[in-house]
Amino acid sequence: KGMPKSTNPSGIGYVDYVLWGKDGKPLAVVEAKRTMADARKGRHQAELYADCLETMHAQRPVIFYTNGFESFIWDDTFYTDREIQGFYTQDEIQLLIDRRTTRKDLRTFKVNKDIAGRDYQLEAIKRVAENLVIDGKDGTLRGAKRESLLVMATGSGKTRTAAAIVDMLTKCNWAKRV
């Protein structure tokens, strides 16, 4: 219930699949299109279903849409959509939802100077943090880009810089394993 009348005059829509959590709340909504159709055609429809489920259960589900050959994930509270090679497990989806509230701002992280303490290393780590996170329109934390590229000379401490970035990502709850 709760579909826009412009989309469906009855206000009732039928989602293809809802993946439920152990707490009875929706973890994910899956919109499945025919194999001959572009999977992206299901994006808007899946978003509408997610809106309805969020209203009904007070938890925004992660959005998946697929045609059987291409599959996409979209955690629209944090990142833009991206193609994936397979579906996530129940625990993996629950972790994505849990991270919405437990993630810390990378830009305020104090780097362990025992790992990477040179000024240019600290500047590189700061730039990576700024590249990965932005402030949402509503003041919440949002993901910006999912990747960063550092170009550093031989002997400048690339490994230590990378280790400090991994330390930052894990301690701020952005990554579990690297």
Question: Where in the sequence are the language-model features?
Answer:
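ATP-dependent helicase/translocase motor core
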Residues: 1-177
